[in-house]
Regions:
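Amphipathic alpha-helical dimerization/coiled-coil segments
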Residues: 1-3, 76-121
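N-terminal helix-turn-helix DNA-binding core of bacterial DNA-binding proteins
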Residues: 2-43, 66-73
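Conserved strand-loop elements at the edges of beta-sheets that form or border functional pockets
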Residues: 10-13, 50, 59-61
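A structural preference for long, well-packed, hydrophobic secondary-structure segments
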Residues: 24, 50-53, 89-90
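Alpha-helical residues within the helix-turn-helix
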Residues: 35, 46, 52-53
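Short amphipathic alpha-helical/adjacent loop interface patches that line ligand
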Residues: 37, 48, 121
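Conserved active-site tyrosine of GNAT-family acetyltransferases
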Residues: 51, 68, 117
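Beta-hairpin "wing" of winged helix-turn-helix
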Residues: 53-63, 69-72
Length: 122
């Protein structure tokens, strides 16, 4: 478990708060986060690495994709920090467009899954 101070430091940048709020809604890849936020891939990867080191996010692999999500068993203190970040993200101007873009990405992902399963099921 990461220290509380390390977690607080990780949440000191609005960009990381935006990313954490999105990951609190759904598991996402770096490519999807890039598309949603308009941030550069290298910046997102750096932010995710810092939040992962702080124990705020975790990742899992599915084929060639790494999916990031809010840490599941993060402990009470870290869970509280995640809740506070999710509540405070509304103060960041880009958050409204992030949510619109997130919805679009999730709908596209769902449609791609349906096409795949319909093709496989024949």
């Amino acid at each position: 478990m990461a220290s509380t101070l390390k977690s607080l430091r990780a949440l000191s940048a609005p960009s990381r708060v935006r990313l954490l709020a999105l990951l609190n809604e759904s598991e996402l890849t770096v490519r999807e986060l890039t598309e949603i936020t308009g941030m550069r891939q290298s910046g997102i990867s750096m932010h995710l690495g810092q939040m992962q080191e702080a124990g705020l996010v975790e990742s899992s692999r599915d084929g060639k994709n790494a999916y990031y999500r809010v840490a599941r068993d993060s402990g009470a203190e870290t869970g509280l920090l995640i809740e506070l970040a999710a509540a405070g993200v509304a103060e960041i101007p880009e958050h409204a467009s992030d949510l619109v873009n997130l919805k679009r990405i999730l709908e596209r992902r769902e449609n791609q899954d349906l096409v795949y399963f319909n093709r496989v099921a024949g």
